[in-house]
């Protein structure tokens, strides 16, 4: 057992699976401390983030992260700058010693003029951890009392205060009063609070889209109602026109549904993360104040229900449009079958008429050809009349039935030959 034991071949993804649980370690946070976290929507993916981090790394004289990296940390000033890549956004976290008073200026930080944002800012947070002292509690006055969330957590080891409003820098301010937490416990609490603020903002992105889609869905519903009312009047001669209108309405609906599919799904996922983080806070309410959980639930839940309602309206309307389309197509198919039947009957009548005409022409042809044949026979009889004991006129008359029968047989044989060739 001195050598490396159990050295079996490992599955291809084993190392990645084992390392995933350690990919987001909590930062060890001391008290007092101020933390800034900015979240950016990054449409360019990690390429843009890598360019920003490479520039910051060169300025600090350290190696930049690898191109495939999803997280990176570097020393910056009196703290650490941490970057993490998520599905549609990236976060930049930096901590430093807290200023003398809550909300005080932090003159040196990595997000100054030399910082190139990788995308549009979606969330900005300033979180301060301070010892629970009478001086620190004076900071309660800095929050808006109409939306102040004030609670205890970690069995009374910490006090949480925030009003979810933004300061002059556009950052949501959060104050944590420390009553004896460990550095690891403080780091875990800080990460939960940062996640709650970041993901609750992302979860709300679906609401403006839902509000913009609602009038469009209403117009589509009204359009469908108009078409179905016309269908109820049994105006089948306008089925093509109504089908075109239904198709246009369905195209508009599907365009909106495709636009909202990802956003609504992401909002549900982000809302689930917020709810999970709130549960892990295990807040104890302070009498007279709301907890973070109850405050956000009262505001996030209606927004998510609005998104869900729009999704359900889209799905129901899509089914109604499909049923109306199927009914109109059945009308059109029945009308096409009726027209085809009428066309076939007309073609059948035309074929019968053509056959009678052909038979008439054949009869006339037999008479005409027989006439010429008899005439030729008459000329022949006259030419040899001096050698015949019978009058040429009598011979010509006797030749008439034979000529007619012979020509008729020839014409019949030719027609039968043509019919057999057509069937092959």
Task: Explain the meaning of each model-derived region.
Residues 1, 158, 168-170, 178-191, ...:
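Hydrophobic alpha-helical signal-anchor/transmembrane segments
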Residues 1-123:
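N-terminal pre-transmembrane cytosolic regions of membrane proteins
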Residues 84, 95-245, 251:
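Extended alpha-helical interaction modules
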Residues 166-182, 212-217, 221, 256-281, ...:
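Short, positively charged
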Residues 225-228, 232, 275, 365, ...:
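Signal for well-folded cores of large energy- and translation-related assemblies
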Residues 250-374:
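Membrane-associated alpha-helical segments
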Residues 352-424:
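Alpha-helical transmembrane anchor segments
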């Amino acid at each position: 057992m001195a050598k490396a034991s159990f050295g079996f071949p490992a599955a291809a993804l084993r190392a990645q699976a084992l390392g995933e649980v350690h990919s987001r370690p909590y930062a060890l946070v001391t008290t007092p401390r101020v933390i800034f976290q900015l979240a950016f929507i990054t449409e360019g993916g990690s390429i843009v983030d890598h360019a920003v981090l490479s520039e910051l790394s060169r300025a600090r004289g350290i190696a930049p992260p690898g191109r495939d990296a999803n997280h990176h940390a570097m020393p910056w000033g009196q703290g650490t700058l941490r970057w993490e890549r998520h599905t549609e956004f990236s976060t930049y976290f930096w901590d430093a010693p807290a200023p003398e008073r809550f909300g005080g200026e932090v003159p040196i930080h990595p997000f100054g003029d030399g910082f190139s944002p990788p995308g549009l800012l979606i969330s900005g947070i300033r979180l301060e951890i301070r010892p629970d002292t009478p001086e620190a509690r004076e900071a309660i006055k800095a929050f808006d009392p109409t939306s102040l969330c004030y609670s205890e957590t970690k069995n009374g080891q910490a006090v949480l205060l925030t009003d979810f409003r933004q300061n002059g820098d556009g950052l949501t301010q959060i104050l944590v009063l420390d009553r004896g937490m460990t550095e690891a416990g403080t780091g875990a609490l800080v990460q939960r609070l940062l996640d709650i603020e970041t993901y609750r903002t992302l979860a709300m992105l679906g609401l403006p889209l839902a509000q913009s889609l609602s009038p469009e869905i209403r117009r589509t519903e009204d359009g469908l109602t108009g078409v179905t009312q016309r269908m109820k009047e049994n105006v089948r001669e306008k089925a093509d026109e109504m089908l075109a209108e239904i198709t246009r309405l369905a195209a508009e609906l599907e365009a909106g549904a495709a636009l909202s599919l990802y956003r609504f799904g992401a909002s549900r996922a982000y809302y689930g993360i917020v709810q999970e983080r709130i549960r892990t806070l295990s807040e104890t309410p302070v009498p007279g104040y709301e907890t973070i959980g109850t405050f956000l639930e009262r505001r996030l839940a209606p927004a998510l229900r609005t998104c869900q309602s729009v999704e359900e309206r889209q799905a129901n309307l899509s089914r109604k449009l499909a049923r109306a389309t199927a009914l109109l197509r059945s009308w059109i198919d029945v009308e096409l079958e009726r027209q085809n039947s009428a066309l076939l009957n007309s073609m059948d009548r035309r074929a019968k008429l053509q056959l009678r005409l052909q038979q008439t022409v054949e009869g006339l042809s037999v008479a005409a050809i027989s006439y010429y044949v008899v005439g030729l026979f008459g000329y022949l009889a006259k030419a040899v009349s001096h050698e015949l004991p019978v009058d040429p006129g009598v011979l010509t008359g006797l030749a008439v039935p034979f000529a007619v029968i012979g020509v008729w047989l020839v014409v019949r044989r030719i027609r039968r030959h043509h019919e057999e060739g057509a069937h092959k």
